[in-house]
């Protein structure tokens, strides 16, 4: 849709935070049109994400949650083990910028580090923000903006005649 509306040479960048980060990683499974991804504090396995979502809604841990969810999912033909963002990232060559706070209490910073070990594009990177909790990396506005700008500037190469138009 984007390329039809804006032109085939349009670059598509997806940015997602938390569950949105999971969505942008999984989007890579369904289209080859995505050019770059910025993933901020997403979990890499469904088994990590569902307990977080449950706790955020109910505020108490439930040891019975995963077995019940797995059984219901299977009834509808969905295998949670087949829907892990890390597996999508392993099979993608798209440049990905992974962002995570090292004090994240919802999704372990280890998820970001593990993503860093499986990303195939040499322009991919992992940015860890010290002292930041879940989805709070953006509170370091200057660094976050610079990080996004640097990542995207590295990806977008404008022809010489467009440099003035884009402020280069």
For each feature predicted by the language model, list its residue ranges:
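Short alpha-helix in the alpha/beta-hydrolase fold that links the catalytic acid
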Residues: 85, 94, 108-117
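Catalytic histidine neighborhood in serine/cysteine hydrolases
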Residues: 116-135
